[in-house]
A protein has these predicted regions:
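A short acidic, Gly/Pro-enriched loop at the edge of an enzyme's catalytic core
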Residues: 7-22
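C-terminal alpha-helical "lid/dimerization" subdomain adjacent to the S-adenosyl-L-methionine
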Residues: 58-108, 112, 118
């Protein structure tokens, strides 16, 4: 069975060792203290539980990166044209640029006691899936 929750990732209202999986998609970079959130993820996972995180990342191919930077600069303009506001789209681009690289995020996950860490780039590294286990 799957149950969906929406809570403060830095202070989860769950018991220790309660979940088999902890997933988060495009949310980790919006959390004030990512380190605290990962600590909470570890706390609520059962031993043998798995963390899966899908998040924007750093493009590894230089040619693709140049196109992605140009595309990223147009997103706020398109947002302003379509919905009349550019600020949410500027926030999106800034939060992506300021977030951890794949390896930096992997190290932060490791710092929070996770093991068997890995990440997989998708779309040339525009996004990455990080995976880790609580052993």
């Amino acid at each position: 069975n799957v149950k969906w929750y929406c809570n403060n990732a830095e202070n989860l209202p769950f018991k220790n060792n309660e979940f088999d999986y902890y997933t988060i998609s495009f949310g980790l970079r919006n959390i004030d203290n990512v380190d605290n959130a990962l600590g909470e993820a570890f706390r609520v996972l059962k031993p043998g539980g798995r963390l899966l995180c899908l998040e924007f990342s750093k493009v590894k191919n230089e040619i693709l990166n140049q196109f992605y930077k140009i595309y990223s600069k147009t997103i706020p303009k398109i947002g302003k044209f379509i919905v009349g506001k550019s600020e949410p789209y500027e926030y999106l681009i800034n939060s992506i640029e300021e977030f951890y690289s794949q390896k930096e995020l992997l190290e932060l996950i490791k710092k929070n006691n996770f093991t068997n860490l890995s990440f997989r780039n998708l779309s040339g590294g525009i996004v990455a899936i990080h995976s880790a286990w609580k052993i």
